[in-house]
Regions:
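N-terminal core-binding DNA-recognition domain of tyrosine recombinases/integrases
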Residues: 1-94, 111-112
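Long, amphipathic, Lys/Arg-enriched alpha-helical "connector/arm" segment
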Residues: 90-117
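Basic, Lys/Arg- and aromatic-enriched nucleic-acid-binding interface segment
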Residues: 107-135
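Short, basic (Lys/Arg/His-rich) helix/loop patches that form interaction surfaces
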Residues: 112-115, 210-254
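Short, polar N-cap/turn motifs at the start of nucleic acid-interacting alpha helices
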Residues: 145-148, 217, 247-267, 291-294
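Catalytic-site neighborhood detector that most strongly recognizes the C-terminal catalytic loop/helix
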Residues: 157, 256-281
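C-terminal catalytic core of Y-nucleophile DNA break-rejoin enzymes
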Residues: 160-177, 190-213
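C-terminal secondary-structure termini that scaffold catalytic or DNA-interacting sites
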Residues: 282-295
Length: 295
C-alpha cells in the first residue's frame, strides 16, 4: 500500500512513516475507532496533542506522507484524514556555504602540483568540487562509471537509487586519468578508488571527509572552530553556481540526482545574484545619518 518506491525515499524515512502510521491507528483503536470511517476530527486532535513520537520527533511528517500515499486506496476517507493533519513547518538552521574566495582557494589547492596531495586525493577533491557528488557515491564509483572517450560520468546514487548521467568535465576526467595511470594499484577490483596497501580494498565514504579536510588545510580555509567542512558544501556550491548562470531547475535537479524540485530550495537560498534582482531599492527614501552611526 505504501508507495515509497516512487518517491525515492531512504529506508529510514519509510520505516519512520510506517511506524508513525501504526502508532496513529493504534491510538485510534484505543479511542474506540473500529474502521477508518470512525476516525473523527476530535480523535485526530487528541492524538496530535500528545506531542511527539517515542523518538522525540514530531509525528506530522511521516504520518502525512503515509496518508497521502494511501489516498488511492480510499480517496474520500484518506483525503479527509490527511486534511485534518496540520502543516508543520520545521525551522532550519542557516546553511554554511563556500564563498567565492574559499572556492578559489580550494580550486588552487587542487591545481597546485607542488603540495602534498596524492593523485587519488586530488581526483576525489576534483570530483566533489565540480560535480557535487555525495561522499558515498564517490567512494562507490566504479571504473565503468567513467567514460573518458565520450565524456560521460554515470552512476546510481546510493541514498536515493536515482540513476545520474552527467557530462564529465575535462578537469575531472584528467584528474581521474592521472590517478588511474600513475597511482592506482594494479587490481581486478571494479571500484575506482582503492586503498594504497594490499589487498587494496575499495575506500569507504568515511575516508572522504578526511581528504576534504586535508585540502582545506592546504587551502587555508575553514580553519575556525565550528566551521563546516562536510562534502555537502560542494553540492550547495554546484547548485548555486548553476543557478547563478541561469541553468534551469530541472537540469540542476538532474545533475544532483534530486527527484523533488523542492529539494533545491535550501541550496538556492545562497543564489545571491538572483536574490539581489528581487530586492527593492530604498534610495528614494531619506534616511538620517544617525541611523548609520555606530555607537
Amino acid at each position: 500500500m505504501f508507495c515509497s518506491g516512487k518517491r525515492g525515499l531512504k529506508e529510514s524515512s519509510v520505516r519512520r512513516a510506517k511506524f508513525e502510521a501504526t502508532s496513529f491507528f493504534l491510538a485510534m483503536q484505543d479511542q474506540g475507532c473500529q474502521c477508518i470511517e470512525d476516525i473523527s476530527e476530535s480523535a485526530v486532535i487528541h492524538y496530535l496533542r500528545t506531542g511527539t513520537s517515542n523518538n522525540g520527533r514530531t509525528k506530522l511528517p511521516g504520518l502525512s506522507l503515509f496518508m497521502r500515499d494511501c489516498i488511492p486506496q480510499n480517496p474520500y476517507e484518506y483525503r479527509r484524514i490527511y486534511g485534518l493533519i496540520p502543516i508543520k513547518y520545521v525551522a532550519r538552521k542557516t546553511i554554511q556555504f563556500l564563498t567565492v574566495e574559499e572556492s578559489i582557494a580550494f580550486q588552487t589547492a587542487l591545481e597546485d602540483l607542488s603540495n602534498t596531495l596524492s593523485l587519488k586525493q586530488r581526483a576525489i577533491g576534483t570530483l566533489l568540487f565540480y560535480t557535487g557528488m555525495r561522499s558515498c557515491d564517490v567512494a562507490n564509483l566504479q571504473l565503468e562509471s567513467i567514460d573518458l572517450q565520450n565524456g560521460i560520468l554515470q552512476f546510481t546514487q546510493i541514498k536515493t537509487g536515482v540513476a545520474v548521467r552527467i557530462p564529465l568535465l575535462p578537469v575531472v576526467g584528467n584528474a581521474i586519468y592521472d590517478y588511474c595511470t600513475m597511482e592506482r594499484p594494479s587490481s581486478d577490483s571494479p571500484f575506482l578508488f582503492l586503498g594504497e596497501f594490499a589487498p587494496h580494498h575499495p575506500i569507504t565514504s568515511k575516508a572522504i571527509p578526511w581528504v576534504v579536510s586535508k585540502i582545506m588545510d592546504l587551502a587555508g580555509i575553514r580553519t575556525n572552530k565550528g566551521d563546516r567542512r562536510g562534502t555537502h558544501l560542494f553540492r550547495h556550491r554546484v547548485a548555486t553556481v548553476m543557478a547563478e548562470n541561469n541553468v534551469p531547475a530541472p537540469v540542476i535537479s538532474a545533475t544532483l540526482g534530486q527527484k523533488n524540485p523542492k529539494s533545491l530550495d535550501s541550496y538556492l537560498s545562497a543564489d545571491i545574484t538572483h536574490l539581489r534582482e528581487c530586492s527593492l531599492s530604498i534610495k528614494e527614501y531619506a534616511i538620517r545619518e544617525e541611523v548609520f552611526d555606530i555607537v
